[in-house]
A protein has these predicted regions:
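Walker A (P-loop) phosphate-binding loop of ABC-type ATPase nucleotide-binding domains
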Residues: 37-41
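Helix-to-loop junction immediately C-terminal to a conserved catalytic motif
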Residues: 50
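Conserved beta-strand
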Residues: 7-10, 17-27, 58
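C-terminal coupling/interaction segments
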Residues: 235-272
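Catalytic Walker B motif of ABC-type/P-loop ATPase nucleotide-binding domains
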Residues: 151-155, 160
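Conserved ABC transporter NBD signature motif
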Residues: 58-66, 73-74
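ABC-family P-loop ATPase nucleotide-binding domains
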Residues: 76, 82-138
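ABC transporter nucleotide-binding domain
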Residues: 167-247
Length: 272
């Protein structure tokens, strides 16, 4: 099966920061969580993938086609939802839909109308009248109305209340069933715990891990202690009210099952 997205050894250097040989892929019907703290390189990676900035090196393919030389054909099949979605605040939504539709050969007005109805977005309203969650749903509507096979989402749940975040994850899981691939950049770990098939963890511009959620959870356990245990590798030690916690490798048999949020927080604290 051809990957929807495959990038290898993507690099980009700025003063004080380097995106260093980033490689990742997204398969049809797969939600890939792209996680890292602010400034780790998530947005730089997405901008480099989509040609918003020019990488120094690396190769990127979408749908088996090199991005260079096929940008227009590829962008017809991609839906991009940037973080902090903003539109002309006083334009009617029907106007925004009309303008957006002109950029896509396969725009489906019926699909657009159905999605707007499903999400409860009246075309007579303006973006200034929509909540943050509704603005994200509008962005998804515009991304899906031209038959996108791949969605690239940059921090789509930031600033949303828990109910709106949960509704958005419901939508993404439904799209996954339809074979749409999703690259979901976020720093909200609980969202990925519910929805992601695989996690790509970026740290200081480098891919530190690329594993399924199950592999992360089977590799580590969470150990609570008051006195430092001898002869055990402690990963990402963190002070708690009554002692300390750290990750340990599962083969030690110590500790308890660790959730994805505990794993990622302790890995981020680790110096290794």
């Amino acid at each position: 099966m051809t990957a929807l997205l495959k990038t290898e050894n993507l690099s980009k250097t700025y003063p004080g920061f380097r995106l260093d040989n980033v490689s990742l892929r997204v398969e049809p019907g797969e939600i890939v969580g792209f996680i890292g703290r602010n400034g780790a390189g998530k947005s730089t990676t997405l901008k480099s993938l989509l040609g918003f900035v020019h990488p120094d090196s690396g190769e990127t393919e979408f749908f088996g086609m090199p991005f260079r030389g096929n940008e227009n054909a590829i962008k017809q099949q991609i839906g991009f939802v940037p973080g902090g979605v903003d539109y002309y605040p006083k334009s009617k939504i029907r106007t925004l839909v009309g303008v957006t539709s002109r950029f896509y050969k396969n725009w489906d007005e019926k699909v657009c109308d159905e999605l707007l109805d499903r999400f409860g977005i009246p075309q007579s309203k303006t973006p200034s009248e929509l909540s943050a969650g509704m603005k994200v749903k509008l962005a998804l509507t515009l991304a899906l109305s031209h038959g996108a096979k791949l969605l690239i989402l940059d921090e789509p749940t930031s600033g949303l209340d828990p109910v709106s975040r949960d509704e958005l994850l419901d939508i993404l899981l439904d799209l996954r069933k339809d074979g749409i691939g999703i690259l979901f950049s976020t720093h909200i770990i609980s969202d990925l715990e519910r929805a992601a098939d695989r996690i790509v963890y970026i740290r200081n511009g480098n891919i530190a891990a690329d594993r399924t959620v199950g592999e992360f959870e089977s590799d580590y356990r969470l150990l609570f202690y008051t006195g430092r245990p001898e002869g055990i590798e402690l990963i990402g030690e963190r002070a708690e009210r009554d002692g300390f916690t750290a990750l340990v490798k599962s083969e030690t048999g110590l500790g308890e099952k660790a959730g994805l949020e505990d794993i990622m927080l302790h890995l981020e604290r680790s110096t290794k």
